[in-house]
């Protein structure tokens, strides 16, 4: 609250106090009139005491407000004095700054230094302009360049002549190379025709005859098996008649070896088909030679396989003839056979074609059953 507001408030309070005094004077006049009219003033005693109490309270309130107002005025005077001191200090600092700004000796020295540097730069630009003019004059002298261009043109002409000669020689070499390629292509075609003829002859005559022999051998083995069964039944009947009912010997005939041999023979004669490896014209000579060597190796394997089949057939016939002489054998694995660990059957050898019927190879067979797994009877030792 400002001083003006406080003064206006005090003025309003004084006016209210004057109005109260006027009202009190009017009330006193009225009271005096009433006293004259009414001698009994006992009812007004309490009103007078109340009015006095109110007037004392009003005086106390004005006194307290006067003290508070005096304290506020003192505080305002103190703050004004502090601001005056701050303004005086700022005026001193401002005067010092103005004095320093009015001292332009450093600025004049910097201007002199700048003028000196500008003069040096102007001199450097003049020197550069002179050097540039000299360089331009030197660059305009193209006599050496023209001489070098003439020499380069001469070299290009000579190189062009050499390239023309080389192109002629290269064309002749290319024609000769084409002739050699055509000759080799014809040779490859003749080899392919001969190979096709050989393959047709091999598969149409030799392989078919081998398959016919195998089928005949299988039929012969079937006849042997039927004869063995007939002999076994006759011998069993003879044993029952000889020993009497229920007194037949406990020996049991063994036909597993014969059946195993037949099964092994039937399994091992499966010959995988030979895929057509003849390439069209245009293949290189090395691939043709590799195909011929591969077919030769296949033929050698087939011939060795046929010889092995004939040998196994002879051995089976001999073993069957021995079994006719002696029908009762001990229940043991033959020493000249080896067991396949996949199907459990016994064969004279575990071969690649047999393992292919189990979707396996010899390498995979050894990985699954061990490197020492026997593939032939000799391996068991």
Curated annotation (Swiss-Prot):
Region ranges (7 X approximate tandem repeats): 22-274
Sequence repeat spans: 22-59, 60-84, 85-122, 123-160, 161-192, 193-232, 233-274
Compositional bias segments (type: Acidic residues): 276-318
Gene Ontology CC terms, in alphabetical order: gas vesicle
Compartment(s) of residence: Gas vesicle
Gene3D superfamilies noted in UniProt: ROS/MUCR transcriptional regulator protein (1.10.10.1550)
GO biological process: gas vesicle organization; regulation of DNA-templated transcription
Highest rank taxon of the organism: Archaea
Keyword Repeat in record: yes
InterPro entries noted in UniProt: Gas-vesicle_GvpC_halobac (IPR008639), ROS/MUCR_sf (IPR041920), ROS_MUCR (IPR008807)
Keyword Repeat included in the entry's annotation: yes
Signal peptide as annotated in the record: none
Predominant localisation class: other
UniProt similarity note: Belongs to the halobacterial gas vesicle GvpC family.
UniProt protein name: Gas vesicle protein C
Biological source species: Haloferax mediterranei (strain ATCC 33500 / DSM 1411 / JCM 8866 / NBRC 14739 / NCIMB 2177 / R-4)
Organism lineage: Archaea, Methanobacteriati, Methanobacteriota, Stenosarchaea group, Halobacteria
Gene: gvpC
């Amino acid at each position: 609250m400002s001083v003006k507001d406080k003064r206006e408030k005090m003025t309003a309070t004084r006016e209210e106090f004057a109005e109260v005094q006027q009202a009190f004077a009017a009330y006193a006049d009225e009271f005096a009139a009433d006293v004259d009219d009414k001698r009994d003033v006992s009812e007004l005693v309490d009103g007078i005491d109340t009015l006095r109490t109110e007037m004392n309270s009003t005086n106390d309130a004005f006194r307290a407000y006067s003290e508070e107002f005096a304290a506020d005025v003192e505080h305002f005077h103190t703050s004004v004095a502090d601001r005056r001191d701050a303004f005086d200090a700022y005026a001193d600092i401002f005067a010092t700054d103005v004095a320093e700004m009015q001292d332009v000796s450093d600025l004049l020295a910097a201007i002199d230094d700048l003028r000196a540097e500008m003069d040096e730069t102007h001199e450097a630009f003049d020197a550069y302009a002179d050097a540039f003019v000299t360089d331009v004059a030197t660059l305009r002298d193209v006599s050496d360049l023209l001489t070098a261009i003439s020499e380069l043109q001469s070299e290009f002409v000579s190189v062009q002549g050499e390239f023309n000669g080389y192109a002629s020689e290269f064309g002749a070499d290319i024609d000769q190379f084409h002739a050699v390629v055509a000759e080799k292509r014809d040779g490859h075609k003749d080899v392919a025709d001969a190979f096709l003829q050989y393959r047709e002859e091999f598969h149409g005559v030799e392989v078919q005859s081998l398959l016919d022999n195998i089928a005949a051998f299988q039929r012969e083995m079937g006849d042997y098996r039927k004869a063995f069964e007939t002999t076994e039944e006759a011998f069993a009947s003879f044993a029952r008649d000889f020993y009497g009912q229920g007194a037949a010997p406990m020996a049991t005939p063994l036909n597993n070896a014969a059946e195993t041999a037949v099964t092994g023979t039937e399994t091992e004669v499966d010959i995988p088909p030979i895929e057509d490896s003849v390439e069209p014209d245009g293949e290189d000579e090395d691939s043709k030679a590799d195909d011929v060597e591969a077919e030769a190796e296949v033929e050698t394997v087939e011939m060795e396989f046929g010889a092995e089949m004939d040998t196994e057939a002879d051995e089976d016939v001999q073993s069957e003839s021995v079994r006719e002489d002696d029908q009762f054998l001990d229940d043991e694995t033959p020493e000249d056979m080896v067991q396949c660990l996949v199907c459990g059957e016994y064969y004279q050898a575990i071969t690649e074609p047999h393992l292919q019927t189990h979707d396996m190879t010899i390498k995979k067979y050894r990985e699954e059953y061990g490197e020492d797994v026997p593939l032939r009877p000799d391996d068991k030792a």
